[in-house]
Amino acid sequence: AFLGFDAVSTAAQETKNPKRNMPIGILVSLLVCTVLYMVFAHVMTGVAHYTAFSGQQGIAPVAIAIEHMGQADAAGIIQPDYPWLNRAIVLSILFGYCSVIMVTLLGQSRVFLSMSHDGLLPPFFSHINEKFRTPARSNLLFMVLVGLLAAFVPARLAGEMTSIGTLMAFTLVCAAVLVVRRTMPDVPRSFKTPLVPLIPILGILTCLCMMLFLPADTWIRLVLWMLIGLDIYVGYGMKHSKLEHGGDTRHGQVALNMIGLILAVLCVITGLWHQQTVGWGENKVLLIISFVFAFTHCAYYMWRIWRK
C-alpha cells in the first residue's frame, strides 16, 4: 500500500528547493495514503467479512466486495445489485495502475541514472536524450522488462516479491539512518529523523516482522536477487565506482566477503525451509537452485578471502 512514496526522492535533482520540498512531499503523501487506505479498508470490511478476502490476489478483493452488495437467491448465491459497478471499478483500477507504473518507472530510471553516474552501472543507464532531457534508454529498457514480467509472472509471485523487496529496502534505509547519524554526526541536515535510535529500530523490527509472514520461496528469491546484485557490484561496480569508499580498503574487502558468505548460508537455510514447508517429496527445483547458488558463491568468496 505504501510502495512508491520513496520515489519522490528520486526526483530531487529536478525539484526546486529540494531541502524544503522533498520532506514535505514524502510526509504529506504518507499521511494522505494512510488516511485513504484506512477508509478503503473500513469500507471493504463493512461490505464483506474480512475472511472473504483471504487468499485473493490483485483486484479480486474489490470484485468480492461488490458481489456481496446484493441479495441471496433461493440457492443461497448472492446476486449483485450492481453488476455494472464491478466492471467500472475494475476499469478504473486499471487506469490507476497506469499512473502507478509511470511513477515507478520514473523513479527506477533515476536511481539507475545516479548509480551509473557513480560508476556502479555501465554508462548506458546515464545516457540522456538530447530532445526530451530524460534517460530514455533506461525508460525503454524498463518498459520492456516490466511488460515481460507482467505478462509471464503470476500475480501472487510478483506481489510477494514486490512486498519483500520493498520491506528489505525500508529495513536498509532504517539501518542507514543509524549508521550515518553515528558516523557523520556533523553533516548539515535540513530534516532530521526524530527520536533516533528509537524510530529506526522500530522501523527495522516492523519490516522484519512483516517479512516473516511471507512464504519461504519468496525468501529464496530475495536472497538470490541480493547475491546477483552483489555479483554486479563485485564484478563491475567496485572497479568503476568514482567514490571508491570501502572497495579498496582491507576492512571494506573483508566486509564484502563476509556479506557474500552470509548470503550464501542464508540461501541454503531458505532452500531447506521452503522444502520443509512444501514437503520433501515435492518439486525440488528451488532447493537445487538455492544450493547451486550457495555453494558457488561460498567457494568464490572463500577464494577471495584466501587470496587476500
Give residue spans per PLM region:
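Hydrophobic alpha-helical transmembrane segments of multipass integral membrane proteins
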Residues: 1-4, 13, 31-38, 91-104, ...
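TM-loop-TM module centered on a large, flexible mid-protein loop between adjacent transmembrane helices
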Residues: 25-105, 120-161
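Transmembrane helix-loop boundary segments of multi-pass membrane transporters
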Residues: 85-91, 95, 148-175, 188-192, ...
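C-terminal membrane-solvent junction of multi-pass transporters and transport-like membrane proteins
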Residues: 125-133, 170-221, 228-264
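Charged/polar low-complexity intrinsically disordered segments, enriched in acidic residues
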Residues: 245-296
